[in-house]
Amino acid sequence: MAAEFDGKIESKGLNPGLIVLLVIGGLLLTFLVGNFILYTYAQKNLPPRKKKPVSKKKMKKEKMKQGVQVPGE
């Protein structure tokens, strides 16, 4: 019985679905590692972001809420 199957077993190589999964997984892993490296580099070397300047109108409103007299009024 074992002699019947000797010639019929062939090596087909890797499954095409497995190859696609490995390629997509590799690309995703490369993307995530690259993002992490860029993020750590930016945290060390880039200056902190500047805050937006507060408008004079908003400053007056805040001071009015606190009850402080606004100069010039």
UniProtKB/Swiss-Prot annotation:
A Pfam family in this protein? S1FA
Q: What is its main location?
A: nucleus
Q: Name one GO cellular component term.
A: nucleus
**Bias category Basic residues: which stretches?**
47-63
Q: Which domain of life is it from?
A: Eukaryota
Q: Where is this region: Disordered?
A: 47-73
Give the keywords, sorted: DNA-binding, Nucleus, Repressor, Transcription, Transcription regulation
Per UniProt, the short sequence motif Nuclear localization signal occupies residue numbers 47-52
* UniProt key word DNA-binding: yes
Cell compartment(s), UniProt: Nucleus
Residue runs in coiled coils? none
The GO molecular function terms of this record are: DNA binding
PANTHER family per UniProt: DNA-BINDING PROTEIN S1FA2, DNA-BINDING PROTEIN S1FA3
- Entry similarity comment: Belongs to the S1FA transcription factor family.
Physiological role: DNA-binding protein that specifically recognizes a negative element (S1F) within the RPS1 promoter.
Q: What is this protein called?
A: DNA-binding protein S1FA3
Organism, scientific name: Arabidopsis thaliana
